[in-house]
């Protein structure tokens, strides 16, 4: 189940607000300029789908986003617990960073935790299958896929070069809960 937990950005351990209600999550995030929607990830992809199979199955969703915002490229990120690079990738994504473009993800299976540092708050968004999130360009954030990751998401880009991060050097991510 998707969830949003909001913390103060001073490392406070007590949440300011929490919900698993999709409408409440959307309202909170939209107020911060973050797009959050529940889409339908209802295609049978099998146990370990290829990126090509995922893109073919969800081309209709990609086409909607491209028509709406003019995105130029897309790919699939898929991570499983048996991936030999999981620890290195988790460490990379756990560092606070920004992008020069919106970070758009449509989760078609599994889950991951987007942590958005907006103003004086940290918004932890547990995204699961069916969730579409678009983090605005320039928003400091990090992503936790957990120690035993299992997710597949379609990534949509303005930049044909794909995922390019600008790391902030802030240790803030170390102060907040992570996925197990």
From Swiss-Prot:
GO biological process: L-methionine salvage from methylthioadenosine; L-methionine salvage from S-adenosylmethionine
EC class: oxidoreductase
Keyword annotations of the record: Amino-acid biosynthesis, Dioxygenase, Iron, Metal-binding, Methionine biosynthesis, Nickel, Oxidoreductase
Catalytic activity: 1,2-dihydroxy-5-(methylsulfanyl)pent-1-en-3-one + O2 = 3-(methylsulfanyl)propanoate + CO + formate + 2 H(+); 1,2-dihydroxy-5-(methylsulfanyl)pent-1-en-3-one + O2 = 4-methylsulfanyl-2-oxobutanoate + formate + 2 H(+)
E.C. numbers: 1.13.11.54, 1.13.11.53
Signal peptide range: none
CDD domains, per database record: cupin_ARD
Molecular function per GO: acireductone dioxygenase (Ni2+-requiring) activity; acireductone dioxygenase [iron(II)-requiring] activity; iron ion binding; nickel cation binding
Site (Important to generate the dianion): 105
Positions annotated to bind Ni(2+): 97, 99, 103, 141
The protein's annotated pathway: Amino-acid biosynthesis; L-methionine biosynthesis via salvage pathway; L-methionine from S-methyl-5-thio-alpha-D-ribose 1-phosphate: step 5/6
Superkingdom assignment: Bacteria
Site annotation May play a role in transmitting local conformational changes: residues: 102
SUPFAM superfamilies linked to this entry: RmlC-like cupins
InterPro entries on file: ARD, ARD_bac, RmlC-like_jellyroll, RmlC_Cupin_sf
Cofactor note: Binds 1 Fe(2+) cation per monomer. Binds 1 nickel ion per monomer.
Site (May play a role in metal incorporation in vivo): 96
Cofactor: Fe(2+); Ni(2+)
UniProt key word Glycoprotein: no
Chain residues that bind Fe(2+): 97, 99, 103, 141
Record's subunit section: Monomer.
Summary of the function given for this chain in its UniProt record: Catalyzes 2 different reactions between oxygen and the acireductone 1,2-dihydroxy-3-keto-5-methylthiopentene (DHK-MTPene) depending upon the metal bound in the active site. Fe-containing acireductone dioxygenase (Fe-ARD) produces formate and 2-keto-4-methylthiobutyrate (KMTB), the alpha-ketoacid precursor of methionine in the methionine recycle pathway. Ni-containing acireductone dioxygenase (Ni-ARD) produces methylthiopropionate, carbon monoxide and formate, and does not lie on the methionine recycle pathway.
Family stated for the protein in its record: Belongs to the acireductone dioxygenase (ARD) family.
Protein name per its UniProtKB record: Acireductone dioxygenase
Annotated source species: Cronobacter sakazakii
């Amino acid at each position: 189940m998707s969830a949003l937990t909001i913390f103060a950005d001073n490392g406070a351990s007590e949440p300011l607000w929490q919900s698993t209600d999709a409408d409440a999550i959307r309202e909170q995030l939209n107020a911060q300029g973050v797009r959050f929607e529940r889409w339908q990830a209802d295609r049978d992809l099998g146990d370990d789908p290829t990126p090509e199979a995922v893109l073919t199955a969800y081309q209709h969703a990609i086409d909607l986003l491209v028509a709406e915002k003019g995105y130029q490229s897309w790919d699939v990120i898929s991570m499983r617990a048996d991936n030999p690079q999981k620890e290195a990738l988790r460490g990379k994504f756990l560092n606070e960073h920004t992008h020069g473009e919106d970070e758009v993800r449509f989760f078609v299976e599994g889950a991951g935790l987007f942590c958005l540092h907006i103003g004086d708050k940290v918004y932890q968004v547990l995204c699961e299958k069916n969730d579409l999130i678009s983090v605005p360009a320039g928003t400091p954030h990090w992503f936790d896929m957990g120690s035993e990751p299992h997710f597949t998401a379609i990534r949509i880009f303005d930049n044909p070069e794909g995922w390019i991060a600008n790391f902030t050097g802030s240790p803030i991510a170390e102060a907040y809960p992570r996925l197990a």
